[in-house]
């Protein structure tokens, strides 16, 4: 059976902790989307870890940790995390990497930085991890899958073609140094050495595991409100954050995802720009930020202070509905123990109209009938 652990809100709901708990009884843990742009914080007997690409099940010797085809795989970051985990006494995790996973290229990170610089005050608050440029290339069909590392002639030919296009942008739009094909090729050959022992047909592996009755856990990143289709667009991430995408990003049949655990925390937080109805400011926000999370509410990837707010029932109801929740894990209620009363947002007042729906346009009769 497959269970998915996903977020109801903007991310940072505590999915890592819930995944870590459920991993104790799982055989396989799969990352199926996203990349190193968001982190899951785990605290256990080995210490405190902020995992950006490694699945949260790496601390259990009986599990296999899998990178699915839907992941934006930053190979150096992945193996840096792997080595850090092992250096702290964790037994070397069993890992597998999909041959269809696409790689975050060095220039994706550069383009992410350059575009944020170009946009200035109109930027999206990117973590500068290369995620948007990565997915742009993936859907423009000029990305690089892991399996392409093993055909060096075709790889170099494709790399030269892609660099020609990228260099036009670097020269005329960003006014930055051009890419060197030989240097990039040499770097990709280092990537090949790193991943070679772990590459497999993950979809086939997971389908065989299901036939054997194995317990599989899909670990999602961020939350519903960051989904590119159903989130608060355009302040979203570039890959689907919904449990439904687990079937695509892991390569399993949709009907096998029988449990969807949606994680929501007792207050709200967000990293980056965008609408945040229940947001609080000043000393009120600072106190909640200090008390929250594991050592405070700061981004696991960027270290930036998270924007803080009270629990948003409207957004959370929407998030759970879109995820198809079969179960809800409610986290960090203990953090709010310093309050006499816990503020909660139960509806939105939009120009005098009260609504309990997360709306992008004016409500129609059909919208209100279904609220």
Model regions and ranges:
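Conserved phosphate/anionic-ligand binding catalytic regions in large, soluble enzymes, centered on
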Residues: 6-18, 125-140, 215-250, 268-271, ...
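Internal alpha/beta core interface subdomains
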Residues: 78, 82-205, 216
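Catalytic or ion-translocation cores adjacent to nucleophile or general acid/base/metal-coordination motifs
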Residues: 26, 30-34, 236-262
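General beta-strand structural signal in soluble alpha/beta enzymes
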Residues: 5-7, 29-33, 51, 95-99, ...
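A glycine- and small-aliphatic-rich helix-loop capping segment at beta-alpha/alpha-beta transitions
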Residues: 21-26, 47-50, 111-119, 140-147, ...
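Conserved small/polar residues in nucleotide/adenosyl-binding loops
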Residues: 360-367
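A glycine- and small/hydrophobic-rich beta-loop-beta segment
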Residues: 249-347, 355-359
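Basic, polar low-complexity surface loops/patches
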Residues: 1-98, 102-105, 329
């Amino acid at each position: 059976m497959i269970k998915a652990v996903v977020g109801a809100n903007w991310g940072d709901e505590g999915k890592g902790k819930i995944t870590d708990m459920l991993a104790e009884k799982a055989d396989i843990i799969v990352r199926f989307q996203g990349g190193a742009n968001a982190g899951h914080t785990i605290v256990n007997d080995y210490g405190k870890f902020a995992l950006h690409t490694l699945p949260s099940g790496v601390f259990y010797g009986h599990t296999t940790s899998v990178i699915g085809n839907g992941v934006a795989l930053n190979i150096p970051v992945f193996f840096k995390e792997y080595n850090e985990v092992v250096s702290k006494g964790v037994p070397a995790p069993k890992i597998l990497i999909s041959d269809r996973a696409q790689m975050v290229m060095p220039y994706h990170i550069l383009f992410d930085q350059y575009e944020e610089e170009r946009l200035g005050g109109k930027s999206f608050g990117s973590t500068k991890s290369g995620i948007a440029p990565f997915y742009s290339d993936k859907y423009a069909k000029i990305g690089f899958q892991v399996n392409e590392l093993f055909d060096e002639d075709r790889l170099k030919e494709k790399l030269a073609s892609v660099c020609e296009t990228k260099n036009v942008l670097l020269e005329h739009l960003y006014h930055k140094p051009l890419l060197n094909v030989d240097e990039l090729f040499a770097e990709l050959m280092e990537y090949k050495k790193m991943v070679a022992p772990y590459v497999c047909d993950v979809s086939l592996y997971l389908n065989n595991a299901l036939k054997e009755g194995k317990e599989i856990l899909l670990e999602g990143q961020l939350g519903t409100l960051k989904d590119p289709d159903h989130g608060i667009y355009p302040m979203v991430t570039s890959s689907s954050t919904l449990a439904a995408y687990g079937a695509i990003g892991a390569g399993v049949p949709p009907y096998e995802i029988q449990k969807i655990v949606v994680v929501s925390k007792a207050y709200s937080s967000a990293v980056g720009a965008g609408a945040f109805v229940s947001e609080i400011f000043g000393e009120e926000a600072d106190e909640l930020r200090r008390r929250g999370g594991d050592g405070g509410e700061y981004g696991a990837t960027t270290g930036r202070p998270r924007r803080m707010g009270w629990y948003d029932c409207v957004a959370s109801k929407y998030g759970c509905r879109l995820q198809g929740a079969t179960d809800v894990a409610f986290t960090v209620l203990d953090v709010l123990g310093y309050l006499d009363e816990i503020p909660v947002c139960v509806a939105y007042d939009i120009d005098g109209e009260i609504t309990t729906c997360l709306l992008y346009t004016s409500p129609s009769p059909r919208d209100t009938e279904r609220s």
